[in-house]
Amino acid sequence: MASVIIDDTTLRDGEQSAGVAFNADEKIAIRRALAELGVPELEIGIPSMGEEEREVMRAIAGLGLSSRLLAWCRLCDFDLSAARSTGVTMVDLSLPISDLMLRHKLNRDRDWALGEVARLVSEARMAGLEVCLGCEDASRADQDFIVRVGAVAQAARPPPAFADTVGVMEPFGMLDRFRFLRQRLDVELEVHAHDDFGLATANTLAAVMGGATHINTTVNGLGERAANAALEECVLALKNLHGIDTGIDTRGIPAISALVERASGRQWPGRRAWLAPVFTHEAGIHVDGLLKHRRNYEGLNPDELGRSHSLVLGKHSGAHMVRNSYRELGIELADWQSQALLGRIRAFSTRTKRSPQAAELEDFYRQLCEQGTAELAAGGMA
């Protein structure tokens, strides 16, 4: 099985989400959880933010857990100097690489960028640090210029990171870009995707198909602006759709997802597989097929996430599922009872917008029996 390296940036780009601020204990807890999950590389902060940030980064580095740790730095002397005191072994030196950003953000040009890449990559290596060269706004940059930047830095062999900073790539274009870079650069390549058009995960997968060896992710897709490629989606899709191993223990995904949700104060759409709805079935046709053979309606094995299929009753259930559910409660139904209870269940779900619980199902059955008894009594009196 082929492999891809996860470089998770929950503790850096994830925390850059508007309104998200992890405290030290939360950062350490997330760091421990990522290590338990088997994530090999982590961006743990921005040392130029100040001594408080650097102190937390040192505490994280001092845990002595597995995973290589990166500090995110602008491509400048101050940031590189600040990173040296944090205990990390690797720096992500980030440089705007599009003409638009070079001109309107830094008031610089391509020649300046090439010179700074050569100088600061060399300085970082001499300081004993490994380097990832972050190419900010690579999706809007001239691709030949990205190759020139990669060639300048190639002696130090930092993996260039292709950042779709404003999320304007689509999968076919991303595939072509990485094939282009792979043909011209004999280095590892990393992708950093944003979700402006809901394509961060798809673009990340396309980059891997084009030759990316490293991928940036965040837990739950947490991240600045439109967020990032979700660790969970990327790991599960690479494994199940492409047979690519990331070394991640997927059974730990629900727990770390919940941890980051609490720490960030951000809740995530119920559609996401690791939060269980993908394994919850109501529609009669689906339930019938699942009971006959689980793979009839199983694209993702819930065992990978420590989950199991859940069959619930609702508006779209059939009489067979009603009988099966009541059998689990120790109640055997006649056909007419199944049909009568199905009507009650559908009315309940329409009114309450949820599935009935076991106690409510028992109430429905009791009411049905009482109704039948009353009707029999009324008939006898007549």
Swiss-Prot record:
Under catalytic activity, the entry for this protein gives: acetyl-CoA + 2-oxoglutarate + H2O = (2R)-homocitrate + CoA + H(+)
The EC class name is transferase
Q: One GO molecular-function annotation for this sequence?
A: homocitrate synthase activity
Instruction: Give one Pfam hit by family name.
Output: HCS_D2
Question: Which terms are listed as keywords in the entry?
Answer: Nitrogen fixation, Transferase
Q: Please give the biological process terms from Gene Ontology that the record holds.
A: biosynthetic process; carboxylic acid metabolic process; nitrogen fixation
Q: Does the keyword Transferase apply?
A: yes
The residue ranges of the Pyruvate carboxyltransferase domain are 4-254
Q: Which InterPro entries match?
A: AIPM/Hcit_synth_CS, Aldolase_TIM, LeuA/HCS_post-cat, NifV/FrbC, PYR_CT
Write the protein's name. Homocitrate synthase
